[in-house]
Curated annotation (Swiss-Prot):
It is found in: Cytoplasm; Nucleus. This is Polyadenylate-binding protein, cytoplasmic and nuclear. Its main location: cytoplasm. Residues 1-49, 363-417, 607-649, 727-753 are annotated as: Disordered. It holds the Pfam family RRM_1. GO terms for cellular component: cytoplasm; nucleus. It comes from Aspergillus terreus (strain NIH 2624 / FGSC A1156).
Length: 753
């Protein structure tokens, strides 16, 4: 039998890559449950498949093979792993070629240490019905912490053949104080219960009984809740005695036990328990004594609960309160960020007060850890220094002390309320959703102290996380589609993304190898192999004889995708790619010519078939003039491309009105001239880097030259660091870093050759 066909115990069967949730605390014991009628086939299975549990996550098939092959020939080994993360689930299957080897492995290797953890071996039971019957399954509690799986197995092995034995452990490997032993027959289980129940194991009296499934325990528990007899009382006066406590509750019925909880010194802890013989008496005590004042304190009297019950009730109460709070503040609580450090709670409230009634306004701050020195410590230091000085300086010291006291008073006043540093964001809660909506409309992107505010409805952390994950997934999908569209273009390696400004030649550092330091964005052109713009390898040989384009200036397929409108010259050709600016030029099919350039998409500059003479091409030199002869050229008036003009006076309204893919293009066209004035050589690169930012932040940079200059400097430092790291890698590889100009020339020569 192959390991793929073998199944796991019920508690550890993977469902969609995750272990099945156990139905009982005894689930680990029910792993190998088998009906009494199946005993012969269980002890002598037709297959030789073993289940190996309690494995360390780092255990591999090779480690298990080394251990189990010492017994006999192993047919196959499989460590079960999560379907998604591929992490080990902590158990495996070992298949032998014959049953005898499996029996020897079960006898000799059970509880053997593997990576410091004792493994647990049992026959693999493929029938889940037999695993979940529960016959022969014994539950043991009140175990000493020193008792492990092997010690428990050795203790109970005298009463019959054990199929599975396990001590429950927490996440740190410590015993939880209970365990399970699953016998082959019900008679063996009854025999173990008869002889071990109530015995001392490691000086602790243990309870041994038949395992009850969680479903049965739950139904029994609900019945016990409805017929409770044990009553819990708290808020008791500490002076009350045991006798007074008993007399207080005796009038409701016969009491089997009553006790007050006391500390180590014998003082009352203010609560106790009373157990009645009947449920009616307990219910009467709860109804009569709950919320009753005794010695000036209002009592709480209710059904005694176990710890897990109380925790579950508290969890439900917390969840209900959280949902109620979320629904209460839905649509009225605003999140405000980009606040300056001088804005406190009062100023934040004043900023939003004109838009409605504010119920709360809070600026989030860091926890103030550092405290100024207290006046007491100052006085102590002064007294110490006073003792060290000679008596002749006492008068001077007294004067200094008086002035120091005055300073201490001033410091005390200033230290009354020390606020931490502002985190730059806060929350404002209005009384109605309409007021909150009005505040968002009026205050979002408003300049406050030179910074544009970001105002939006507050969201819970899990909602923000889900939205962010959806956004990232959508972005990755778009990138995959773009990559698939450009799959026909050979790309031995890619340069960093570059933004081409209107009429400018984009700058790409030459001679680089490796991946993109920054992810491409809409409005940026992917870097090209080689060193200079316009150089493409592969099936685009240099054209000779003045036919259209000069050497190393070929147009690759899909090259126009991702180029911003402002960077597109006439005819859909990016400016600065080695082509001169000209009137509207169309690539068309000339009479007897070869037509459109292969793979060239019909861009904005190619609005229809033009018919010229000869092959479609673009002149290498000179400015195109109306009527100028050219092979395969038809001049068009430039008035038809007004939509391609660079955006001027870009506003949030005009940006929001544009389609999402064009927004980055518009921002890039507006940013490029400003950046070019500061960094002419790296303007295209820095623009591409800044386009990674949020649109609202880019709009604020357009309005604030100082902030833009700071961002440009920051981007320049990041770029310099990147180039420095690339140079360091080249030196480590035995190559000296080359200057930009030399690297560019070298890559040009490579492309020519």
């Amino acid at each position: 039998m192959s390991a793929e066909a073998s199944t796991t115990p019920a508690a550890e069967t993977p469902v969609n890559g995750t272990p099945e949730t156990s139905t009982t605390p005894a689930a680990p014991a029910a792993e190998a449950t088998a009906a009494e009628t199946a005993a012969p086939s269980t002890s002598q299975p037709h297959s030789a498949s073993l289940y190996v549990g309690e494995l360390d996550p780092s255990v591999t098939e090779a480690m298990l093979y080394e251990l189990f092959s010492s017994i006999g020939q192993v047919a196959s080994i499989r460590v079960c792993r999560d379907a998604v993360t591929r992490r080990s689930l902590g158990y495996a299957y070992v298949n032998y070629n014959n049953t005898a080897d499996g029996e020897r492995a079960l006898e000799d290797l059970n509880y053997t240490l593997i990576k410091g953890k004792p493994c647990r071996i049992m026959w693999s039971q493929r029938d889940p019905a037999l695993r979940k019957t529960g016959q022969g399954n014994v539950f043991i509690k009140n175990l000493d912490a020193a008792i492990d799986n092997k010690a428990l197995h050795d203790t109970f092995a005298a009463f019959g053949n054990i199929l599975s034995c396990k001590v429950a452990q927490d996440e740190f490997g410590n015993s939880k104080g209970y365990g399970f032993v699953h016998y082959e027959t019900a008679e063996a289980a009854n025999n173990a219960i008869k002889h071990v129940n109530g015995m001392l194991l490691n000086d602790k009296k243990v309870f041994v009984g038949h395992h009850i499934s969680k479903k049965d325990r739950q139904s029994k528990f609900e019945e016990m809740k409805a017929n409770f007899t044990n009553v819990y009382i708290k808020n008791l006066d500490q002076e009350i005695s045991e006798e007074e406590f008993r007399q207080m509750f005796e009038k409701f019925g016969e009491i089997t036990s009553a006790t007050l909880s006391r500390d180590q010194e014998g003082k009352s802890r203010g609560f106790g328990f009373v157990n009645y013989s009947t449920h009616d008496s307990a219910q009467a005590a709860v109804d009569e004594m709950n919320d009753k004042e005794v010695k000036g304190q209002k009592l709480y009297v209710g059904r005694a609960q176990k710890k897990h019950e109380r925790e579950e009730e508290l969890r439900k109460q917390y969840e209900a309160a959280r949902l109620e709070k979320a629904s209460k503040y839905q649509g009225v609580n605003l999140y405000v960020k980009n606040l300056t450090d001088d804005i406190d709670d009062e100023k934040l409230r004043e900023m939003f007060a004109p838009y409605g009634t504010i119920t709360s306004a809070k600026v989030m701050r860091d926890t103030n850890i550092e405290r100024t020195q207290t006046p007491d410590s100052d006085k102590e230091k002064k007294e110490e220094s006073k003792e060290e000085k000679p008596e002749a300086a006492e008068k001077t010291e007294e004067a200094a002390k008086e002035s120091g006291d005055d300073q201490d008073k001033e410091n005390k006043k200033s230290d009354k309320k020390v606020l931490g540093k502002s985190k730059g964001f806060g929350f404002v809660c209005f009384s109605s959703p309409d007021e909150a909506s009005k505040a968002v409309t009026e205050m979002n992107q408003r300049m406050i102290n030179g910074k544009p505010l970001y105002v939006a409805l507050a969201q819970r952390k899990d909602v923000r996380r889900s939205q962010l994950e959806a956004s990232i997934q959508a972005r990755n999908t778009i990138r995959q589609q773009q990559a698939a569209a450009a799959a026909g273009m050979p790309q031995p390696y890619m340069q960093p993304a570059v933004f081409y400004g209107p009429g400018q030649q984009g700058f790409i550092p030459g001679g680089q190898r490796g991946g993109l330091p920054f992810a491409p964005q809409p409005g940026m052109m992917m870097g090209v192999p080689g060193g200079r713009p316009g150089q493409y390898p592969g099936p685009f040989p240099g054209q000779q004889g003045g036919r259209g384009m000069g050497p190393n200036q070929q147009i690759p397929p899909n090259f126009a995708q991702g180029i911003p409108m402002g960077a597109m010259g006439p005819g859909g050709i990016p400016n600065g790619m080695g082509y001169p600016q000209m009137g509207q030029v169309q690539f068309g099919r000339g009479a007897g010519g070869r037509g459109q350039v292969p793979g060239m998409p019909m861009g904005q500059g190619m609005r229809g078939p033009g018919y010229g003479q000869g092959r479609g091409g673009v002149p290498v030199q000179g400015q195109m003039r109306p009527g100028q002869g050219g092979r395969g050229q038809n001049a068009q008036p430039a008035a038809g491309r007004g939509e391609e003009a660079p955006a001027a006076g870009l506003t949030a309204q005009s940006l929001a009105a544009a389609p999402a893919p064009q927004q980055k293009q518009m921002l890039g066209e507006a940013l490029y001239p400003k950046i070019q004035a500061q960094q002419p050589e790296l303007a295209g690169k820095i623009t591409g880097m800044l386009l990674e930012m949020d649109n609202t932040e880019l709009l604020s940079l357009l309005e604030d030259d100082e902030a833009l200059r700071a961002k440009v400097d920051e981007a320049l430092s990041v770029y310099d660091e990147y180039m420095k790291n690339k140079g360091t890698e080249g030196e480590a590889a035995g190559e000296a870093p080359k200057p930009k100009e030399a690297a560019t020339e070298e890559s040009t020569e490579e492309n020519k050759s």
